[in-house]
């Protein structure tokens, strides 16, 4: 069994080669720009336009970018000395192997060396343990490890929190540092400046079909959901009163809405979980009553499928930094996305242009891309300025609706806590 799992692991690592090569190549330049970040964690940092959020904590375990090791020639990397013969493995492969361990084994391994202490405390390992073992039945405690310990070993709760922040000297890792960096980096102003989407207000259905739907072009529509009850009513307090104890789909689990907001208030991670539920109107009929399909999208051939229709509408709630990396909507569908609260940054590429840093498989079933949305902005956004076919970009605000044509690649990131409804359709 172990050999089978290892073969499967090595197969997965091979599939990630392109993604990792891009991440590591770009990380070298980033760490040179940000090599002094760790020494100035408590201050506002501005290096080549990169700014760390004012509320950002220092790296919990003192991990530094590899560029700092190059600047400190008298130092040795405790990452390598602490891993022994395993030091030749990439950081990601080490973490993939540790992902096979349970919580007790991780705890024991953390005592072996400083290096294993850092690796076994990597938050995504504990996030996976929480989601796999506790499903959605947890209250977030500021970190995934503290959440797991609090739920499974209540008597050790405070003790674990105290021990969770030991700093290790002379530990250098681009992979681990960039994970922290992506979780705490502010969006650069230049990432938000470009707004080249066509905006329309009050156009007829015929104009929409002729100028946008038939030629398969994006458009941002203003004023077409002004009569929604959702636009007037849906804020956090209203939703918690209405359905705070109702469970909604959040990543691979279901969570009560009130507990999800407790998570989103505290979370500081590279890929925040966001609520994305296709059955919201069935679970809470009043939510379905407080919106209607905008007039431009009511001709929907999916309707002939009746109860056999695949999931087609979702409520989306998430904190700043959450969102969707580049993808194409399934089943040759188009989509509309209406922002009810907050704001979202959109980037769209036409079907014949694959976004930089994105590597779809030949059949399109799998897509290799940067680990997080912020990582894509850091490493690839700048290159689009020189492309002949530039992406369509915009910030979609509350009360606005964006039309995403069939086959278009699109990325979206919440700039603040946001609530939206999206629906796929075929016309």
Regions found by a protein language model. Give the residues of each.
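N-terminal accessory scaffold of Fe(II)-dependent oxygenases
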Residues: 2-401, 409-427
């Amino acid at each position: 069994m172990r050999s089978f799992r290892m073969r499967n692991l090595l197969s997965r690592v091979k599939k990630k080669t392109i993604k990792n090569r891009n991440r590591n190549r770009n990380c070298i330049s980033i760490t040179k720009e940000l090599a002094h970040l760790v020494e100035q964690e408590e201050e506002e940092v501005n290096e080549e336009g990169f700014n760390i959020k004012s509320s950002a904590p220092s790296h919990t375990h003192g991990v530094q970018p590899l560029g700092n090791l190059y600047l400190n020639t008298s130092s040795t990397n405790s990452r390598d000395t602490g891993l022994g013969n395993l030091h030749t493995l990439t950081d990601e492969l080490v973490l993939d192997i540790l992902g096979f361990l349970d919580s007790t084994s991780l705890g024991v391994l953390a005592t072996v060396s400083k290096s294993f202490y850092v690796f076994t405390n990597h938050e995504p390992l504990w996030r996976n343990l929480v989601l796999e073992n506790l499903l959605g039945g947890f209250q977030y405690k500021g970190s995934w490890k503290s959440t797991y310990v609090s739920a499974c070993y209540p008597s050790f709760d405070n003790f674990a929190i105290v021990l969770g922040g030991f700093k290790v000297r002379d530990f250098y890792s681009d992979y681990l540092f960039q994970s922290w960096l992506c979780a705490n980096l502010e969006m650069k102003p230049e990432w938000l400046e470009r707004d080249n989407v066509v905006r329309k207000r009050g156009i007829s259905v015929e104009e929409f079909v002729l100028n946008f739907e038939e030629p398969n072009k994006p458009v941002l529509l203003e004023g077409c959901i002004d009569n929604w009850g959702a636009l007037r009513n849906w804020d956090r307090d209203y939703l918690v009163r209405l359905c705070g104890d109702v469970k909604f789909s959040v990543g691979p689990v279901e969570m009560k809405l009130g507990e999800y907001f407790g998570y989103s208030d505290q979370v500081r991670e590279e890929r925040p979980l966001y609520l994305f539920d296709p059955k919201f109107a069935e679970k809470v009929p009043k939510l379905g009553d407080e919106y209607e399909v905008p007039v431009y999208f009511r001709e929907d051939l999916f309707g002939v499928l009746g109860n056999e229709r695949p999931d087609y509408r979702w409520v989306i709630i998430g904190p700043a930094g959450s969102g969707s990396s580049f993808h194409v909507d399934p089943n040759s569908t188009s989509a509309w996305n209406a922002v009810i609260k907050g704001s979202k940054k959109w980037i769209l590429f036409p079907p014949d242009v694959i976004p930089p840093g994105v590597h779809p498989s030949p059949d399109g079933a799998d897509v290799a891309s940067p680990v997080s949305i912020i990582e894509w902005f850091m490493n690839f956004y700048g290159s689009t300025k020189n492309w002949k076919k530039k992406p369509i970009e915009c910030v979609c605000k509350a009360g606005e609706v964006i039309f995403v044509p069939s086959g278009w690649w699109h990325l979206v990131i919440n700039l603040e806590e946001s609530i939206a409804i999206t629906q796929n359709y075929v016309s």
